[in-house]
Amino acid sequence: MTRYIFVTGGVVSSLGKGIASASLAAILEARGLKVTMLKLDPYINVDPGTMSPFQHGEVFVTHDGAETDLDLGHYERFIRTTMTQNNNFTTGRIYEHVLRKERRGDYLGATIQVIPHITDEIKRRIIKGAGDADVALVEIGGTVGDIESQPFLEAIRQLRFEVGAKRAMLMHLTLVPYIATAGETKTKPTQHSVKELRSIGLQPDVLVCRSDHPIDSSSRRKIAQFTNVEERAVIALEDADTIYKIPGILHAQGLDDFVVERFGLQCNSADLSEWDKVVDAKLNPEHEVTIAMVGKYMELLDAYKSLIEAMSHAGITNRTKVNLRYIDSEDIENQGTSLLEGADAILVPGGFGLRGVEGKITAVQYARENKVPYLGICLGMQVAVIEFARNVMGWKDANSTEFDRNSGHPVVGLITEWADATGAVETRTEASDLGGTMRLGAQDCQLAAGSKVHDCYGKDVITERHRHRYEVNNNLLPQLVDAGLVVSGRSEDGALVEVVESKDHPWFVACQFHPEFTSTPRDGHPLFSGFVKAALAQKNKA
């Protein structure tokens, strides 16, 4: 039977519930347990797919094509379990489902209320998402006291009571601030946060106390006394120089032992040697490169969370410190390519909308003409094709129909039809809804032998995740290829261009898929690893 660890946060947001939860999950997995994780988001959007990257950050795409919270990316980077659409749901998704059932008459005329109908649906989805895991960690988004979180907190209160104390526990993250003028940490915010939880019927079993200063034993003892939590279950989690230290920090304080004993689980001791190797490679690099990352959401780097982590993983794999130089593509439009000078490689990630696109195209041209290693992802591939059409073929009006529907040479256009993962044919028009209408999830891709991308992966067929509506226009593709554009990857049926490369360039690869979603600190990713190797070669050449 599945055991549940419910994870909540108090005092302030952005305490790192996702990292702490994933780190505990990693330790339990290292003890031989089957672990999964869920994220419950209180916002009313059905999913984050149409939310602004400036507000929400990255949309993480699962293998089965769900657009989810970026915390699921942390989950997959810390544990081996692959997340699905069942591992993340929102208030909007819950209400949408309940209202659809009400319209069908499934409730037989009953008055639909938050309790029991909404809370029952939340509990049903938690149980479904947990599946047959030994332990399921369920993270509740937001902060205790928020009105939006109340149905979720009530649902976990009920579920905790229904399955019993031997199968459910509550881990609460709080902030223990350091007051510089007093020269000490303060426990009062934690006490009040727990008081808020207890007022709605939830007593924490574990407190993870976040701080930027050490929390001494007397403070932990005081917190335990005022919150009715065992002293050994009051965990001090100070800021770390890398998040991949967190599993070791939690293990050193015995958190996994406490969980295993509480649940009565029989399992091995934790083997964290893989994480020790990751931390060692991260903190003791032998080389260093600088990569210019040209994007349009630089005001909130969480919009590129998986990509930034993937570059870190590539550095770990190559024992190389990867310095990312974040450049807003609009700054290139205004200030020119001097911003790119001195970079060992150039990375152009995905994005939507016209703003900043010309700056990305300029960055591609700089990389191609100056033989600087280039990696383009999603839109980064599309702008590479546009740049090639404009500056190699002379089609000065070349563009994507996303930016100019009247372009004389629409080298990138809307995908009007494709088969989804089930084989069903989906169609789209410019008037289609934005939500849930993209080519999403894992798709097979055939790689051309002898290509740079084939050298990276070392295989003929790969599977990568997608999130896009636009593709290279097949009607103009033959002319692009005749002019020297290398198509080194295609969809399984050969209908869609997945990877392009540039002839006579040391390393120029642009892909339509998002390889960052499958990169992990322990395994890295072959494409990013190859990119960093190319950057090292460029630096050594200079």
UniProtKB/Swiss-Prot annotation:
Q: Which of this chain's residues are annotated to bind L-glutamine?
A: G351, L379, G380, M381, Q382, E402, R469
Single GO BP term: pyrimidine nucleobase biosynthetic process
Question: Anything else the record notes?
Answer: CTPSs have evolved a hybrid strategy for distinguishing between UTP and CTP. The overlapping regions of the product feedback inhibitory and substrate sites recognize a common feature in both compounds, the triphosphate moiety. To differentiate isosteric substrate and product pyrimidine rings, an additional pocket far from the expected kinase/ligase catalytic site, specifically recognizes the cytosine and ribose portions of the product inhibitor.
Does this UniProt record's set of keywords contain Transmembrane helix?
Answer: no
Q: Which residues form the active site?
A: C378 (nucleophile), H514, E516
Family as reported in the entry's similarity comment: Belongs to the CTP synthase family.
Record's keyword terms, sorted: ATP-binding, Glutamine amidotransferase, Ligase, Magnesium, Metal-binding, Nucleotide-binding, Pyrimidine biosynthesis
* Reaction catalysed by this enzyme: UTP + L-glutamine + ATP + H2O = CTP + L-glutamate + ADP + phosphate + 2 H(+); L-glutamine + H2O = L-glutamate + NH4(+); UTP + NH4(+) + ATP = CTP + ADP + phosphate + 2 H(+)
Classification from the root reads: Bacteria, Pseudomonadati, Pseudomonadota, Gammaproteobacteria, Pseudomonadales
User: What's in the GO CC field?
Assistant: cytosol
Q: Where is this region: Amidoligase domain?
A: 1-265
GO terms of molecular function: ATP binding; CTP synthase activity; glutaminase activity; identical protein binding; metal ion binding
* Name of the gene this protein is made from: pyrG
Q: What is this protein called?
A: CTP synthase
Q: Where are the transmembrane segments?
A: none
